[in-house]
Amino acid sequence: MTPTAPSPLVWRDDGLPQSSLYGDVYFSSVDGLAETRAVFLAGCGLPERFAERRDFVVGELGFGSGLNIAALLDLWRREKPPGGRLHIFSIEAHPLSRDEAARILAHWPELGEAAQVLLDHWPGRARGFHRVDLPGFDAVLDLAVMDVVEALEAWDGLADAWFLDGFSPALNPAMWRDEVLAAVGARSAPGARAATFTVAGAVRRGLSAAGFEIAKRPGFGRKRERLEAWRPGVRPVAQRPETLAIIGGGIAGAALARAARAAGLEVTVIDDADAVAASGNPAALVTPALDAGGGPRAALYAQALSRAVTLYEAQPDAVLAREVLQLAAGERDPARFATVADQDLFEPGDMRTLEAEDTRARLETPTPALAMAGARVIAPAEVTAAWAGPVVRRRVAKAERDGEGWRLLDAAGEIIARADRLALAGGAAGADLLAEAPLRPVRGQASWTRGHGAPATAFGGYAIPTREGLLFGATHDRDDTQTNVRSEDHARNLATLAKGLPALAARLAGSTFEGRAAIRATTPDRLPLADLREDGVIVLTGLGSRGFCLAPLLAEHLVARLLDVPSPLPRQLSHLLKLTRFDSPVTRSRL
């Protein structure tokens, strides 16, 4: 069984769920909720310690049915301090299905809305990190579906409290080994508390070696004792920024605005253009870059796609089509598609291969394909308008320090905005605000027509539905920065369409096309720049043609970095996006 396979449940005669992997029950036969409240909540000094920080961080080993988290959410909503936000990080190598969790949580109807919000946003089973919104609770959950040590090493947070709730050390000793407890210690803030139901000697020694002081307490139910642990020290309280100015109103800037507002920041978005790059087209693809290697780059795109689709689906009228067919372009593609479809980075069924005859019925084209059920076509204008909010339509010529914050000026030296923090998200148009960033402009022209339609398809080019017809394209011309629409580029797009979908191209021959040309920013390794500069400025650019896939997750990562709270992005993936990876002095600025 792979780490992402669901853990089989055996329902005992007494109604308790038991893991067939470890032979242990998921909660006490006396009362699982009462045990959670006594062992983990009270054991970590909750709710009293909620008042210590505006952003309170709880880590958990063993997500299981979500019972501990539902109980935590119930307590948090009743006792949270004004303006407080709860960040939860949990690890589960063998995730349960939503239906299994619902059957378990039904034992405690008193958890009510706390259990329901968790079930309504139940995380998937794909390997990696899952960001889960918990609306109405001022809380967010990051679930790591992977090995416990791998997850702890990947997480960049520091917990104020730990729920150590793996299966019994006698039945699952790997969860309690010294390496795990040392990693827990390394991911604990000064003054952190940890609690567990076991007082096994190996656990006590491991926690002590990890820097915790420990004490036995009276146990719950049939257990005579339980364990509480704490780290010495007091976590310093850093001054939190309250305002953020974002230069750039395309998908990068809009995603940053959404993430920042969700975190409680006041946001000003500034852009001198009415529509930015591909954000101004009537439709946009949300697809990952396919990587048969299954390494960090593949994991980045898989996680980004999952998060982007979750957010687009929550936005009214944003989604135009669900599922995108990627057609094979060469003899090796079917085998590559099969490898991608087998990757555990995607949810079961999200990637599946199609034989040539399977696509003929849909597209009149007998070509093997990869059906990407998790991909989308969206209406970019609706998304960027909703996420960015009101946009200040002025051009920023200069930004300068204003005490601890920033002051943005136009060409005449007039102040456009002031803010505590600054974000650069202008794509190719904002490249002049970064010193020697390795950004290269690429011009792309898309074409569209009314009254024709087709399933969303990619084939080197692409053809996707709009609200009124079909969009197809696009050209890809490096170092061309002109945005005039060209008739010859409509012809090029039609020729590309003919290679992938010849029957559709034949029907469109002789039609009149509308179009739009925009300039994207790209990097030498075709991965974006998503980092904080040494001066604290957010940089999100170089998204290329995958902006609608990448921007939502990367924006949340950058806002988390800005506020010094846990990021939804694993460490090894964030390292792919650093400004310094090209050995270029991009941490200096012309601002």
Curated annotation (Swiss-Prot):
Keyword check for 4Fe-4S: no
Record region (FAD-dependent cmnm(5)s(2)U34 oxidoreductase): 247-591
Keyword Cell cycle: no
Region spans: tRNA (mnm(5)s(2)U34)-methyltransferase: 1-232
Cellular component terms per the entry's GO annotation: cytoplasm
Co-factor(s): FAD
EC number of the protein: 2.1.1.61, 1.5.-.-
GO molecular function per UniProt: flavin adenine dinucleotide binding; oxidoreductase activity, acting on the CH-NH group of donors; tRNA (5-methylaminomethyl-2-thiouridylate)(34)-methyltransferase activity
Keywords: Cytoplasm, FAD, Flavoprotein, Methyltransferase, Multifunctional enzyme, Oxidoreductase, S-adenosyl-L-methionine, Transferase, tRNA processing
InterPro entries (alphabetical): FAD-dep_OxRdtase, FAD/NAD-bd_sf, MnmC-like_methylTransf, SAM-dependent_MTases_sf, tRNA_MAMT_biosynth_bifunc_MnmC, tRNA_MNMC2
Localisation: Cytoplasm
Reaction it catalyzes: 5-aminomethyl-2-thiouridine(34) in tRNA + S-adenosyl-L-methionine = 5-methylaminomethyl-2-thiouridine(34) in tRNA + S-adenosyl-L-homocysteine + H(+)
Gene Ontology biological process terms in this record: methylation; tRNA wobble base modification
Gene3D superfamilies, per the entry: D-Amino Acid Oxidase, subunit A, domain 2, FAD/NAD(P)-binding domain, Vaccinia Virus protein VP39
PANTHER family assigned to the protein according to its UniProt record, in alphabetical order: SARCOSINE DEHYDROGENASE-RELATED, TRNA 5-METHYLAMINOMETHYL-2-THIOURIDINE BIOSYNTHESIS BIFUNCTIONAL PROTEIN MNMC
Biological role: Catalyzes the last two steps in the biosynthesis of 5-methylaminomethyl-2-thiouridine (mnm(5)s(2)U) at the wobble position (U34) in tRNA. Catalyzes the FAD-dependent demodification of cmnm(5)s(2)U34 to nm(5)s(2)U34, followed by the transfer of a methyl group from S-adenosyl-L-methionine to nm(5)s(2)U34, to form mnm(5)s(2)U34.
Family statement drawn from the similarity comment of this UniProt entry: In the N-terminal section; belongs to the methyltransferase superfamily. tRNA (mnm(5)s(2)U34)-methyltransferase family. In the C-terminal section; belongs to the DAO family.
Protein name, UniProt field: tRNA 5-methylaminomethyl-2-thiouridine biosynthesis bifunctional protein MnmC
Organism: Caulobacter vibrioides (strain ATCC 19089 / CIP 103742 / CB 15) (Caulobacter crescentus)
Gene of this entry: mnmC
